[in-house]
């Protein structure tokens, strides 16, 4: 059985991708960041998410691989993505096929618009 955690912007699978197919593997975790491209990402922000993921994996080292643990990790990463959005390191992709502001409404810099 494939263990997984799915949030709006983070998907974690207990498995690997081989020939474009997800193959269950309880010795490897695969992270999919923002699969619907709802956010605008830069390399630095993506690296921050991967580092946070690595930290979470390390913190669960020695624990059983369970759906509950994956969901906890997914939730923590989703909150981390929200913090990146709130700090302005990433932004909503207004050209996305779906505009779902699940992390909060977009902020507009009123001073910049007045100039």
UniProtKB/Swiss-Prot annotation:
Keywords, ordered alphabetically: Membrane, NAD, NADP, Plastoquinone, Quinone, Thylakoid, Translocase, Transport
Domain of life from the UniProt record: Bacteria
Top EC group: translocase
GO cellular component labels: plasma membrane-derived thylakoid membrane
One example GO MF annotation: oxidoreductase activity, acting on NAD(P)H, quinone or similar compound as acceptor
Lipid bilayer topology: Peripheral membrane protein
Locations listed in the record: Cellular thylakoid membrane
Record's catalysed reaction(s): a plastoquinone + NADH + (n+1) H(+)(in) = a plastoquinol + NAD(+) + n H(+)(out); a plastoquinone + NADPH + (n+1) H(+)(in) = a plastoquinol + NADP(+) + n H(+)(out)
E.C. no: 7.1.1.-
Entry function: NDH-1 shuttles electrons from an unknown electron donor, via FMN and iron-sulfur (Fe-S) centers, to quinones in the respiratory and/or the photosynthetic chain. The immediate electron acceptor for the enzyme in this species is believed to be plastoquinone. Couples the redox reaction to proton translocation, and thus conserves the redox energy in a proton gradient. Cyanobacterial NDH-1 also plays a role in inorganic carbon-concentration.
Subunit record text: NDH-1 can be composed of about 15 different subunits; different subcomplexes with different compositions have been identified which probably have different functions.
Similarity annotation: Belongs to the complex I NdhM subunit family.
Full protein name: NAD(P)H-quinone oxidoreductase subunit M
Taxon lineage: Bacteria, Bacillati, Cyanobacteriota, Cyanophyceae, Oscillatoriophycideae
